[in-house]
From Swiss-Prot:
GO CC annotations, alphabetized: cytoplasm; GID complex; nucleus
Reported function: Component of the GID E3 ligase complex recruiting N termini and catalyzing ubiquitination of proteins targeted for degradation. GID E3 is regulated through assembly with interchangeable N-degron-binding substrate receptors induced by distinct environmental perturbations. Required for the adaptation to the presence of glucose in the growth medium; mediates in association with the substrate receptor Gid4 the degradation of enzymes involved in gluconeogenesis when cells are shifted to glucose-containing medium.
Localization terms from the record: Nucleus; Cytoplasm
GN (gene name): gid1
Domain LisH intervals: 264-296
Listed name of the protein: GID complex subunit 1
InterPro entries: B30.2/SPRY (IPR001870), B30.2/SPRY_sf (IPR043136), ConA-like_dom_sf (IPR013320), CRA_dom (IPR013144), CTLH/CRA (IPR024964), CTLH_C (IPR006595), LisH (IPR006594), SPRY_dom (IPR003877)
Principal cellular location given in the protein's record: nucleus
Signal sequence interval, chain numbering: none
KW Transit peptide (keyword) present: no
One record GO biological process: negative regulation of gluconeogenesis
Domain called B30.2/SPRY: residue spans: 45-233
Amino acid sequence: MTSTPKNLEKQPINFDNLPLYLQGTNYGENVLRSDPRWLKWEKYLREFDMTREGNVTNTPKAIPSSWNPNDKSDSLELMNNNMGVYFFGPEAGTEHDAASVKADHAIPSNTSIYYYEIQILSRGKEGKMGVGFCRKSMQTNRLPGCTAESWGYHGNSGEKFNCSKTGEAYGPEFTTGDIIGCGVNFINRTIFYTKNGAYLGVAFKKVSDVLYPVIGLKSHGEHVEVNFGQNPFLYDIDYAIQMEKNKLFEQATKSPKQEELKQRQEFLNELISSFLLNNGFVETAKKFCPENTEVSDASIRKEISSMLANGQLDLAMTKIDCQYPVAIQECPDLIMSLRFLRFLQLVKVTHDQRLTKSKGTKQISQEEDLRILQPLMNYAQELSNDYEHTKSSNLQAMIKLSMGLLAYFDPFSSPLSFFMSSDFHKYMAEQINCLLLELTGHSPDSELRRFLQHTVCLNDLLCRNGCRSNTLFNVQSDFLSPY
């Protein structure tokens, strides 16, 4: 029986649920940015206050995840959560008696290479099955490849069909027990197939951009099941993609001329030095670029950042008050950031107190609980009254959202637990470091950070404008730090 099309509803795309080979592409990088793992608090901020000016997110397009019950022939039955397809139509007839079903989503072009596999559970009476890709307009009463804007590999003959009723010799026939893989390479616009893990070669060239996986059946009892990446593939598609990347890496890393190599090295040294200085690593920065290293207050900022990241808020505030006395007067965002961290500290202290009181006795009295909560509630009220005075809309939204922690006995297991994490405190330490840099007349972003941001944006722009080879790359994992 056809399953309810629940996976046709709009749902967040989870990076962990992507096939591994897609995680390493530009598509995977875009999914990661919209995934809570990228920066959990920024993800929640976007969902919490989507009306804030300038807060526009590019949601990645969904990838195929099942067969589409709303785009299939009536002669097909979908089963197993719309992953399986069974033909129960007439046993014989014309070419129009075939039955096809498309996937629930088109393949995003920035996947660079897309691949799926079909397992033949039963060849049925004649094994007249077709596997391939098609445009949205393909009729569902034909096998893939036998009609315009569709490409298919047929099991009963081993022929390939290129938008035509006439087939050409291509590969072996396939039958019950076989696993047929079908891939599209958007970089060179080709379609290829595999059989039982073996590569069969390029079948079609100059194919369209917007494609759907499609399966077609024609004889009674034919039964197949699809793997869109929810399970490991038989064919090593990860290796195939890495080989494509290696070709491009080789082109990009060809030995430059000696003069160009020297200029590159000087440029890289300056980038690294700027990053180290912004983060307070003065001595290391001198090693890379001794002539341009301006020490200024880098060591002091590093010490403050370390205190904040380690939860030593009082020490950090004392240091800031001593080293940057004007900052407290001139930077409301700095004051509010420190008060925000104080609030989170109070949330932790209050939780610890409630936990201690409830040990031994199963339930803490309401009166005792209120007594413990009162200082936190008072501080939260003061913070709520003042947070709108800050200039940073992100800081305002974070404070507003964090007030939800008050609703939970255990904030560490709540949906807002990321506020209590060491990663978030490191993030806030970085933001405060940026504020101190601005106060002392320096850019809050190092040259290296701006260069990397530019690289990521440039790669995205090239991908959107049809530079297909760039879609292979996930700048984050390929060139920075693997996740």
